[in-house]
Regions:
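Conserved structural position within tetratricopeptide repeats
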Residues: 74-77, 110-111, 142, 173-176, ...
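Structural signature of tandem alpha-helical TPR/SEL1-like repeats
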Residues: 61-70, 97-105, 130-138, 161-173, ...
């Protein structure tokens, strides 16, 4: 991904309410990893971690540099289902020059606790040239008026909390309730996005363009996913089409924000 596309995405996500504060946390983590190894690895708080695990991890980080890796390895054995321990172990390993072991630790974080901020951040660290976090589903409404919309808002809230599995579950439930609803189907497709397998989300979202050619949500989210994928030219085209389908709607205004951010990058 080019530097200009990366800047575009970061600027744009700040303006998207669905992005929450997760972008800042992830960017800070990446920045600290690139700095001098005299500082301990950054602690990335994970609300899904049990309090005693969080405390033990922070104590291990305070032992930097002498005992941190050893303590985190012990914690990994003690807490085999903790993504936070494995995320921080990977950070400590990469700062001591053990890149291969760090990558394995991050893969383990994703495997043992996929529905956690630690798993999302671990995937980010394995893909340092991609945008932070996962593409958000942006609802076209703010207050739900149906069970389907309630599911969509819950899924978007889980995305803000960096809980991708829970978000995907809510989006799939919405699509099951309304199999002909373009917004529910779009959310389900967005929820499938994975940096190791981005084609899966596109394979579900692409056909919706043909099925719902006038659905603004489909065009908007296709453009958003294309930014994450790094295809700026096609992203601009889809976002422009989305805006043309309703420039004054919430999604139309967000499409304009993304397009303006692209001009500044």
């Amino acid at each position: 991904m080019s530097a200009s596309v990366r800047v575009w995405l970061i600027v744009a996500l700040v303006a998207l309410a669905a992005a929450g504060t997760a972008v800042g946390v992830t960017l800070a983590t990446r920045t600290d990893v690139a700095k001098q190894t005299s500082k301990p690895p950054p602690y990335a708080a994970d609300p899904t971690a049990r309090p005693e695990i969080a405390r033990a991890v922070q104590e291990a980080l305070r032992a930097w540099p002498a005992g941190t890796v050893r303590r985190l390895r012990i914690l990994a054995e003690r807490y085999p289902q903790s993504g936070l321990v494995r995320l921080e172990l990977g950070l400590a390993l990469v700062l001591t020059g053990q890149q291969a072991d760090a990558t394995k630790a991050w893969l383990d974080a994703e495997r043992v606790q996929p529905d956690s901020p630690s798993a999302v951040r671990a995937q980010d660290l394995r893909h340092p040239n991609t945008p932070p976090d996962l593409p958000p589903f942006v609802p076209s409404f703010s207050q739900p008026t149906s069970a389907v919309q309630a599911r969509l808002l819950r899924g978007a809230a889980f995305q803000q909390e960096l809980r991708p599995v829970s978000a995907e579950r809510e989006f799939e439930a919405a699509a099951a309730l309304a199999p002909a609803n373009p917004e529910a189907l779009t959310a389900a497709a967005v929820g499938l996005y994975d940096k190791d397998r981005p084609a899966l989300a596109f394979s579900h979202l692409g056909p919706l363009v043909r099925r719902f050619p006038h659905a603004q949500t489909v065009r908007f989210h296709l453009g958003l996913l294309l930014i994450y994928f790094g295809d700026a030219r096609r992203a601009r085209r889809e976002l422009a089409l989305a805006r043309s389908q309703g420039p004054r709607t919430p999604l139309g205004r967000r499409a304009y924000t993304l397009l303006k951010a692209g001009q500044k990058s």
